[in-house]
Amino acid sequence: GEAVGLPAQQMGNSEVGHLNLGAGRVVHQSLTYINRKIKDGSFFKNKCFLKVIQHVKTNKSKLHLLGLVSDGGVHSHLDHF
């Protein structure tokens, strides 16, 4: 949950616990970071990603995206699919 940098009611794992253990502060996890960037719109303004999209459009080429899709919520989340 929020005490270890995850959304409320989101179960973590040992990795999340180890990252937060002794930090003296909340270590926000990737899930929280990505959620925040999507919510404030900055996720869709990433210069590197926009440059790649423009290259694909200009050159009529293909873009292959790889990633994780899981309901686990630590390394990936279904909401980001």
UniProtKB/Swiss-Prot annotation:
Catalytic residues as annotated in Swiss-Prot or TrEMBL: 14 (phosphoserine intermediate)
Cofactor(s) named in the record: Mn(2+)
EC number: 5.4.2.12
Enzyme class label: isomerase
Keyword Isomerase belongs to the record: yes
Complex formation: Monomer.
Protein name according to UniProt: 2,3-bisphosphoglycerate-independent phosphoglycerate mutase
Provenance organism: Tomato big bud phytoplasma
